[in-house]
C-alpha cells in the first residue's frame, strides 16, 4: 500500500511541475522581497493611475509598500541595476486626508519612513504622494504632487 502512496505522490509532483505550479515564487520578470513580488513599470503615470494599474494587474496588487531598510535597499538595487535613468519612482504612500497622515495603499502599517532631508515639505500645500527620490539612489523618499507623472513599482503578496 505504501508503494501506491509513494507512486501517487510522485505522479502528483510531476503533474504539478508540468502544469507550471511554482508555489511561493514570483514570475520571471518580478523580484521577490519579504513575501511579496515587485515589478517596476517604466510607463509614466499619475500616482492614482499607477495604483489603479497595479490593482488591475494582479489580485491584491498595489503600489509597493516599504517597512524596513532592507525593503528600501532591495528596491533601490533593482531600480538602479535594471532601469537606468528611470527618474523618480512612485511607491504606495500618500496623505489621503491632506493632514500629513501618511498611509500605504495596501493598508499595511505605516511603521517605517525614509524621508530625504527636509522632507516631507508639502510645497504649495500640494504634495500628498510619495516617490523614491532618484538622486538618493532610490533610498530616500520625497513628497510630490499626485498628478506628477513617474514610473512606478507594483507589488502583490505571494
From Swiss-Prot:
Locate the motif Mannose-binding: 119-121
Keyword tags: Calcium, Disulfide bond, Lectin, Metal-binding, Secreted, Signal, Toxin
The C-type lectin domain sits at: 33-155
Q: Which residues form the signal peptide?
A: 1-23
Q: Where in the cell is it found?
A: Secreted
Q: Which cysteines are joined by disulfide bonds?
A: 26-37, 54-154, 129-146
* Tissue specificity note: Expressed by the venom gland.
Q: Does the keyword Translocase apply?
A: no
One Pfam family name is Lectin_C
InterPro entries, per database record: C-type_lectin-like, C-type_lectin-like/link_sf, C-type_lectin/snaclec_domain, C-type_lectin_CS, CTDL_fold
A GO CC term? extracellular region
Binding of Ca(2+): at which residues?
Answer: 127, 142-143
Please describe what this protein does: Mannose-binding lectin which recognizes specific carbohydrate structures and agglutinates a variety of animal cells by binding to cell-surface glycoproteins and glycolipids. May be a calcium-dependent lectin.
Return the similarity comment.
Belongs to the true venom lectin family.
The protein's name: C-type lectin
Q: Which organism encodes this protein?
A: Cerberus rynchops (Dog-faced water snake)
Amino acid at each position: 500500500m505504501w508503494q501506491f502512496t509513494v507512486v501517487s505522490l510522485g505522479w502528483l509532483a510531476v503533474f504539478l511541475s508540468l502544469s507550471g505550479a511554482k508555489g511561493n515564487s514570483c514570475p520571471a520578470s518580478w523580484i521577490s522581497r519579504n513575501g511579496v513580488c515587485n515589478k517596476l513599470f517604466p510607463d509614466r503615470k499619475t500616482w492614482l493611475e499607477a495604483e489603479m494599474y497595479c490593482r488591475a494587474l494582479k489580485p491584491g496588487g498595489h503600489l509597493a509598500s516599504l517597512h524596513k531598510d532592507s525593503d528600501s535597499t532591495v528596491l533601490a538595487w533593482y531600480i538602479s541595476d535594471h532601469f537606468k535613468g528611470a527618474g523618480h519612482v512612485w511607491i504606495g504612500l500618500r496623505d489621503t486626508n491632506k493632514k500629513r497622515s501618511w498611509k500605504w495603499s495596501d493598508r499595511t502599517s505605516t511603521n517605517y519612513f525614509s524621508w530625504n532631508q527636509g522632507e516631507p515639505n508639502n510645497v504649495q500645500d500640494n504634495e500628498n504622494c510619495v516617490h523614491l527620490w532618484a538622486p538618493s539612489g532610490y533610498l530616500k523618499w520625497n513628497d510630490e504632487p499626485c498628478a506628477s507623472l513617474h514610473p512606478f513599482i507594483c507589488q502583490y503578496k505571494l
